[in-house]
Structures are given as structure tokens and as C-alpha cells.
Amino acid sequence: SSPMDYTPGIFNIKEYRHNSQSDRTINKNHHIPSTIAKELALYVVIYAPVQMAADLPENYEGHPAFQFILDVPTDWEKTIVLNGEIGKYITTVRKDVNSDDWFLGSITNEEGRTVDINLTFLDESKEYNATIYKDPENGGWLNQPEEVEIQNISLTNKDSYRITLPEGGGQAIRFTKK
């Protein structure tokens, strides 16, 4: 895929899942099999030197998860694929070329899964604030695709971190040095 083949960032996922505006029946052949957390993670997973926000401005307005789209760079110093299996899942981290920030994107297919990652890519002896954008506990592309939880925790390169990905879900993290 080239940098312009796929544009992530859809927040209005549900409107694409129904037969029509008047018929609110979920049509499994007419939807985005994704979640907002996965849409954010795709900004890291898919390399694209030119990024854009693919949804309508009113769907981003006032949404706290839009901050990740504002923060994620397009120029990277380093890229590491931490884990994955073609067609199933992937976790990628990238270091911003203009700062000490790292960005993580982890996505899965229609199967939910848990992946454990070591944070050895972070600088030694430094503490990081991790701003995490994740699907809710019972989320997924069929259930709560537009819900996203945002939390902040402190982590170091000696830590490991467990990522829980519901069906069609994802997780995006920004690591900033304290």
C-alpha cells in the first residue's frame, strides 16, 4: 500500500453500519469493522508521510480522542514492529524525529486478543507519561465502536505492558518523557 491508499481517523463509525438513516438495523456488509481506538492506532501502524483526518469536522469537534490525531507526527526517526501475524494483528512503535516521544499502535482483526509488550525501546533510566487511547472493556467493532477510554500512567523501559484488543479494536499510546 502506498501512503495515500488508506486514510484512518473515522470517528463516526456507527453511521456506516446501518442499512440507512431511518433503518437502524446493523448491516454487517455495510459498516466499518473498526473502533475509534483502532482508527487512532492506524496512524502509527500505517506509514504515511502525509496524514489527514478522514471524517467530517463536526465528528471530531469536542472529542478528546482527536488530540491523538493532532499529536501524532508523520516523520519518524525509528520504527519497530514489536509483534504481529499477517492478517491477524500488529503492534508497531515509532519515535518522532523532532522529539523524544514514542507512539505505539496496536490493532487486531475480528478476533479479540491480548498482547504483552516489553518497553525496552524507551530510554533507560527515564520515566515516561503514557497517554493511552483504548477500547472499553466490553468494546469492539460490533459493541461500542465509538467509545474510547483515555488514561495516563507512568512507565519505564523496565516495564512490560499488557494490551487488550477487542474484536476489530486497537490501542494507541503516546509516550512522553517526564
Whereabouts are the PLM-identified features?
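Glycan-recognition surfaces
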Residues: 1-57, 83, 96
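C-terminal beta-strand-rich structural cap/linker in extracellular carbohydrate-active enzymes
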Residues: 152-178
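Conserved, mostly hydrophobic/aromatic
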Residues: 45, 104, 168
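Short, glycine-/Ser/Thr-/acidic-enriched flexible segments
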Residues: 11, 50-52, 98, 109-111, ...
